[in-house]
């Protein structure tokens, strides 16, 4: 399967994508570069598909793919994913996110995009 290296070594790329997946689940909308948004979309689609299955095995698989940080005092990222986000897309078979291209970033003219849940 082809993927973008994002000009980082393996550990940095995995950490970046885990962080972006967690942030997208928390905030439900992220502004980032186009290439990061495309890679993030692949990861988020897989994580939500795993979360919809709701077994212990799939929960452990999800823990590997994101940082489980606290959103507030009552809820963590995985709790929000398994309760709110997975329930929202239970009848949908993929296509949980959308990428909207925006104006290039000022300074280096990098192509920017907004990634959000549908």
Curated annotation (Swiss-Prot):
Keyword Thylakoid: no
HAMAP family recorded: Ribosomal_bL17 (MF_01368)
Xref: PROSITE patterns: RIBOSOMAL_L17
Source taxon at top rank: Bacteria
InterPro entries: Ribosomal_bL17, Ribosomal_bL17_CS, Ribosomal_bL17_sf
One Gene Ontology cellular component annotation held by this UniProt entry: cytosolic large ribosomal subunit
Gene3D superfamilies, alphabetized: Ribosomal protein L17
Protein name from the UniProt record: Large ribosomal subunit protein bL17
PANTHER family noted in UniProt: LARGE RIBOSOMAL SUBUNIT PROTEIN BL17M, RIBOSOMAL PROTEIN L17
GO molecular function: structural constituent of ribosome
Gene: rplQ
SUPFAM superfamilies per record: Prokaryotic ribosomal protein L17
Keywords: Ribonucleoprotein, Ribosomal protein
Originating organism: Phytoplasma mali (strain AT)
Example of a GO biological process term: translation
Subunit structure: Part of the 50S ribosomal subunit. Contacts protein L32.
Family: Belongs to the bacterial ribosomal protein bL17 family.
């Amino acid at each position: 399967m082809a993927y973008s290296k994002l000009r980082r070594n393996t550990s940095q790329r995995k950490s970046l994508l885990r962080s972006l997946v967690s942030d997208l689940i928390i905030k439900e909308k992220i502004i980032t570069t186009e290439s990061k948004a495309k890679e993030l979309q692949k990861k988020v689609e897989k994580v939500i598909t795993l979360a919809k299955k709701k077994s212990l095995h799939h929960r452990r698989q999800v823990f590997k793919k994101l940082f489980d940080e606290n959103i507030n005092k009552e809820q963590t990222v995985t709790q929000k994913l398994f309760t709110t986000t997975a329930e929202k897309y239970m009848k949908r078979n993929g296509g949980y996110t959308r990428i909207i291209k925006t104006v290039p970033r000022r300074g280096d003219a990098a192509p920017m995009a907004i990634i959000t849940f549908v």
